[in-house]
Amino acid sequence: MSEVKIGRKKEKCENCTKQCNKKQSDESINSLQEKGVASGEVRESTSVQQVLLSACLSCDGCISEDEGKRISQQNLDEINHVLALNKKCDTSKHKILVVSVCPQSVPFFAVKFQLDVSAAAQKLCGFLKSVGVHYVFDTTIAASFSILESQREFVQRYRRKHHDANAMPMFTSSCPGWIRYAERVLGSVVTPHICTARSPQQIMGSLVKNFFARQQKLTPEQVFHVVVAPCFDKKLEAVRDEFYNSILESRDVDCVLTSGEILHLMEQSKVTVEEVDSAPLDHVIGEISDSGLTRHDGRGSEGFLEHIFKHAAKEIFGLDVQDIVYKTLRNRDFQEVALERDGETLLQFAAVYGFRNIQTLVHRMRKGKVPYQLIEVLSCPGGCLSGRGQAEGEGGRPDRTLVQQMEEHYSSLPVRLPETNPEVQRLYQDWLDGHDSPHAQQSLHTQYKDHTHLPAHITNPDIQW
């Protein structure tokens, strides 16, 4: 790809999408910032720098001016605008306001409210409904779909690995930062290996705008769908062209707000936690008997690696794995797990989190063979609970005390396997017409593409999987 000039101030290069809501009028070009540079040149003449897109390894990569405009609209002003329209007499402009909360965001509110996770979720729900939100959902159900589809895809890839060079390894991630980097920097070296299952956020978007809207006798454009997430980069994912219906002029997710932005909304409202009435979260298909908050097995980022590992061990090798033992390599954010039988390694997976560890992974890819069948990649060290939309402390670094408290709250939730969730199985039939239907493929999967012409040192033909 040709050189892309990016107006970039040195002190702003850590959080590109965080700066999207702040107009940088003093910079030479009105576009957004990157988080960091892995290699290549950074020419620094004044406070404004020019960065080669192909040299940038960041949470979001380079963002175009058009994307920047769309992301900048995802803020509290947009929500307040919808709420204001709903109060006016012209009902033709009214929208049903739906908020979907990521499970990694709820522990943040538990810490801030000084409540347990379930009580904090009900307080959050009560506050949102008090300002005019109609429905509040938990996105754990969408994560269940994403995990199940990822499990199924891994087994399919593994079984065709001998005649499909792109089958292994499979990269799994719900991290838009990693996806951006893979598409814009690594390109065709990696994109065919990325699991096609949509992230929980975008499956939730499809579920709300498709199934839920139809159940409520609404069209998708009559629903304004907000996602509360721990990460600013989720705003970037929401504006991807793949998740926009040009005929209906409707996005699956209209707006992403971080946990910190929702807390700021509460502060703007000048309401205390004690003053907020608790309210139970809603369910996409109505009330069910066991309606408490749950989490998925594994670490605090939905545990894709663990679920796929256990499923593959059973489905491919007939082995029941109860507990997974991680082997730490460089640090706790670069770990391996292996399945062995009679001294033979049957499966070898890796979890790679954080900027530096992704650099290490890419370096190993360039040098030679990567031994893993599956790699879970996340841009934030520590995973999604450490997202900068909720865990950022002084100096732009994660607040370790806050992250530790959130991890403890998240771990306190009971674990439910996606396979045992009756709501998920019911939706496979009522919404998707079965597990392997064209509707399921369309609603639960997407494709990732090579969006750049890569320089020779990245598209190294010697890279072997």
From Swiss-Prot:
InterPro entries: Cytosolic_Fe-S_CAF, Fe_hydrogenase, Fe_hydrogenase_lsu_C, Fe_hydrogenase_ssu
Subcellular location: Nucleus
Annotated GO MF terms: lamin binding
One Gene Ontology CC term in the entry: lamin filament
Signal peptide positions (record): none
KW Nucleus (keyword) present: yes
Domain of life: Eukaryota
Protein's UniProt keywords contain Zinc: no
Keywords: Nucleus
Transmembrane stretches, start-end: none
Stated family: Belongs to the NARF family.
Name by which UniProt lists this protein: Nuclear prelamin A recognition factor
Organism (species): Danio rerio
Taxon lineage: Eukaryota, Metazoa, Chordata, Craniata, Vertebrata
Gene of this entry: narf
